[in-house]
Amino acid sequence: MIRDEISVSTQTPRWRCIGSGADSKRLHYGRFALSPLRKGQASTIGIAMRRALLGEIEGTCITHAKLEKVTHEYSAIIGIEESVHDILINLKEIVLRSDPYGTREASICIVGPRNVTAQDIILPPSVRIIDATQHIASLTKSITFDIRLWIEKDRGYRIQSPKNYQDGIFPIDAVFMPVRNANYSIHSYGNGNDIQEILFLEIWTNGSLAPREALYRASRNLIDLFIPFLRAEEQNIDGMDNQNGSNMPSFSFSNISADMERMEEEVAFKHIFIDQSELPPRVYNCLGRVNIHTLSDLLNYSQEDLMRIGHFGKKSVEQVSEVLQKHFAVDLPKNKFQIH
């Protein structure tokens, strides 16, 4: 029992991407698994990650627009199909990405008749449009559509309070959150006191950053929250050590041996199920019929072994090999003599 507890405590949880895709330029999806975790850890991490994903990641939005000779949000402009209100709503939906903070200016100057889209926005070099086809306005006559825009990078959302629009400058409600939604679920396994958990995390983004990047940024933000406390505690410990004349032993992740790394990877593979990967249903159903349910089970087979499974041909083997290499950097051996 003591040895089991020690082995559990030395396992390092790892994130794995087990699914990804893009429904459109403005909707990207990713599914991730974190394991192994002790009982209760998955809920703690899941709640924190979801809140960090939805509230702590910066995004870029259009926050103000200036239209000449327009006095009210619900004004109609001759030669433009949409009202000013509709144009502002369309500008609010434009998805942008930028690196530096601060306010940037952009503009549109188009002569109709024609449709105005996001690709017509003249942007500073530091800002990029994610979907250039997003609609802004329809010019029905030969008029000049001239608009000035202000772009900001921030986090959360900013609801503009009603006020008088001076000099034709209209504030736009800004939703800076690049993560549209995030959900998590927990799978428990084991018996008795040796219960462990897997955290599954689903992330949808607006395309300005990939779900994998959102996961990294949320993790980084959570770590940054605790660093000041860790530094303060280290200073207190150093002060106590100097008074007592003793030294605390230093700890470094680089001290972990290669054997431990391999052991942790093997443990993680035992709890990643093949039906959660990008394999087609026909492929993992064939594998399930011969009791191959996890990546650990799968890695006990060579390509030649898989070819002997009923209705499992060369194309299926290639699909399995592609998923293993893409998501786990693992090569499936060609024959049983190359396993391990």
UniProtKB/Swiss-Prot annotation:
Residues 268-340 are annotated as: Alpha C-terminal domain (alpha-CTD). Transmembrane segments: none annotated. Pfam families: RNA_pol_A_bac, RNA_pol_A_CTD, RNA_pol_L. It catalyses: RNA(n) + a ribonucleoside 5'-triphosphate = RNA(n+1) + diphosphate. It is an enzyme of class 2 (transferase). CDD domains: RNAP_alpha_NTD. Its EC number is 2.7.7.6. SUPFAM superfamilies: C-terminal domain of RNA polymerase alpha subunit, Insert subdomain of RNA polymerase alpha subunit, RBP11-like subunits of RNA polymerase. HAMAP family: RNApol_bact_RpoA. The N-terminal domain is essential for RNAP assembly and basal transcription, whereas the C-terminal domain is involved in interaction with transcriptional regulators and with upstream promoter elements. NCBIfam families: rpoA. Belongs to the RNA polymerase alpha chain family. This is DNA-directed RNA polymerase subunit alpha. It comes from Cycas taitungensis (Prince sago).
